[in-house]
Amino acid sequence: MVSNSQKDRAWSKAKRIPGKSPSKYRKDAYGNTLCYSSYGKNSPMGWEVDHIKPKSRGGSDSTMNLQALKTRVNRSKGADQRKRSRHSKSNR
Protein backbone atom coordinates (compact mmCIF):
# COMPACT_ATOMS: atom_id res chain seq x y z
CA MET A 1 0.00 0.00 0.00
CA VAL A 2 1.34 3.41 -0.97
CA SER A 3 1.05 6.27 1.51
CA ASN A 4 -0.19 9.74 0.57
CA SER A 5 3.34 11.00 1.21
CA GLN A 6 4.81 8.52 -1.29
CA LYS A 7 2.11 9.40 -3.81
CA ASP A 8 2.84 13.12 -3.49
CA ARG A 9 6.61 12.59 -3.65
CA ALA A 10 6.30 10.53 -6.84
CA TRP A 11 3.93 13.14 -8.34
CA SER A 12 6.33 15.98 -7.57
CA LYS A 13 9.08 14.20 -9.54
CA ALA A 14 6.96 13.79 -12.70
CA LYS A 15 7.61 16.27 -15.50
CA ARG A 16 5.59 19.47 -15.56
CA ILE A 17 3.57 20.24 -18.68
CA PRO A 18 3.91 23.83 -19.92
CA GLY A 19 0.57 25.65 -19.81
CA LYS A 20 -1.05 23.04 -17.53
CA SER A 21 -1.54 23.16 -13.77
CA PRO A 22 1.27 21.08 -12.21
CA SER A 23 -1.03 20.14 -9.35
CA LYS A 24 -3.41 18.51 -11.85
CA TYR A 25 -1.34 17.29 -14.83
CA ARG A 26 2.16 15.86 -15.29
CA LYS A 27 4.01 13.50 -17.65
CA ASP A 28 5.62 10.23 -16.66
CA ALA A 29 9.06 9.03 -17.78
CA TYR A 30 7.52 7.63 -20.98
CA GLY A 31 5.79 10.90 -21.93
CA ASN A 32 2.29 9.79 -20.94
CA THR A 33 0.02 12.52 -19.58
CA LEU A 34 -1.18 11.81 -16.05
CA CYS A 35 -4.01 13.44 -14.09
CA TYR A 36 -3.55 13.68 -10.31
CA SER A 37 -7.21 12.86 -9.62
CA SER A 38 -6.89 9.67 -11.71
CA TYR A 39 -4.48 8.07 -9.23
CA GLY A 40 -5.10 4.33 -8.91
CA LYS A 41 -7.38 4.19 -11.94
CA ASN A 42 -6.81 2.18 -15.11
CA SER A 43 -7.95 5.06 -17.31
CA PRO A 44 -6.36 7.11 -20.12
CA MET A 45 -4.62 9.39 -17.58
CA GLY A 46 -4.58 6.96 -14.65
CA TRP A 47 -1.35 6.43 -12.78
CA GLU A 48 0.31 4.55 -9.94
CA VAL A 49 3.42 4.92 -7.84
CA ASP A 50 6.17 2.72 -9.25
CA HIS A 51 9.26 1.54 -7.42
CA ILE A 52 12.04 1.98 -9.98
CA LYS A 53 13.99 -0.83 -8.30
CA PRO A 54 11.32 -3.22 -7.03
CA LYS A 55 11.12 -3.74 -3.28
CA SER A 56 11.32 -7.48 -3.97
CA ARG A 57 14.82 -6.86 -5.34
CA GLY A 58 16.01 -4.65 -2.50
CA GLY A 59 14.47 -1.35 -3.59
CA SER A 60 13.33 1.14 -0.99
CA ASP A 61 10.52 3.64 -0.48
CA SER A 62 12.96 6.54 -0.80
CA THR A 63 11.94 9.42 -3.05
CA MET A 64 14.77 8.55 -5.44
CA ASN A 65 13.23 5.10 -6.02
CA LEU A 66 9.66 6.32 -6.64
CA GLN A 67 8.07 7.58 -9.84
CA ALA A 68 4.59 8.34 -11.10
CA LEU A 69 3.84 5.94 -13.95
CA LYS A 70 0.80 5.37 -16.15
CA THR A 71 -1.17 2.45 -14.71
CA ARG A 72 -0.99 0.36 -17.89
CA VAL A 73 2.78 0.89 -18.18
CA ASN A 74 3.39 0.07 -14.52
CA ARG A 75 1.39 -3.15 -14.70
CA SER A 76 3.16 -4.15 -17.90
CA LYS A 77 6.51 -3.44 -16.26
CA GLY A 78 5.59 -5.69 -13.33
CA ALA A 79 4.53 -8.51 -15.66
CA ASP A 80 7.81 -8.23 -17.59
CA GLN A 81 9.83 -8.46 -14.36
CA ARG A 82 7.88 -11.52 -13.20
CA LYS A 83 8.49 -13.18 -16.57
CA ARG A 84 12.23 -12.41 -16.40
CA SER A 85 12.52 -13.77 -12.86
CA ARG A 86 10.83 -17.05 -13.89
CA HIS A 87 13.31 -17.42 -16.76
CA SER A 88 16.46 -16.22 -15.02
CA LYS A 89 19.51 -18.48 -14.77
CA SER A 90 19.13 -18.67 -10.99
CA ASN A 91 15.76 -20.39 -11.42
CA ARG A 92 17.07 -23.12 -13.76
List the predicted regions and their residue ranges:
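Histidine-centered catalytic micro-motifs used for acid/base chemistry in nuclease
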Residues: M45-R57, L66-T71
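Short Cys/His-centered divalent metal-binding micro-motifs
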Residues: S62-K89
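A binding-site-centric feature that preferentially detects glycan-recognition modules on secreted/surface proteins
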Residues: R92
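Glycine-centered flexibility sites
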Residues: G31, H51, G58-G59, G78
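Short cysteine-rich loop/turn motifs with clustered Cys
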Residues: V2-W47, K70
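Short N-terminal micro-motifs specific to bacterial/archaeal maturation
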Residues: M1, R57-S60
